[in-house]
Amino acid sequence: MTRFAWVMATYIATLGVGLSALFHPVPKLIWNATASVPVGFYAVRPVGALRFGELLVVKPPEPLATFLDERRYLPKGVPLLKRVLALPGQAVCRTDRTITVDGAATGEALSRDRRDRPLPAWRGCHTLAPGEVFLMNRQSEDSLDSRYFGALPVTTIAGRADPLWTHEER
């Protein structure tokens, strides 16, 4: 290889490494170890139009990411897997611990976590605006989701989670 070829190869390799530091690609495969959804491997696929019940990969925004990390629920940089419960135009309410969507009860929030620490609580009703989504894993009563932190911007959605291999306790 000529000296010019070595210089160009080194330049291209350095440029590639440098550019990779600027971009944070979404993983194509993730492992879920939490009990909110079945433990296992999930493929991360692009999201089209959001649909009720769809399982999403969500990157928690600040200050939620810091809260999750400080409480040791989820380290920073690790995504959440949550289901779509309400979409723009729908009214989501929290009255005491009851969550309703368009007047229908959809679940209950806990007041304290497993370590007896108080959980965040919001009150009132909110009609989701364009660009907002309400995420809740109804099958898991202790899932840390929108019943505690409210609606999230759709910009936090990293993709759709499709199960590849999961293990459900029976």
Predicted segments, located by residue:
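Extended hydrophobic leader/signal-anchor segments used for secretion and membrane insertion
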Residues: M1-R170
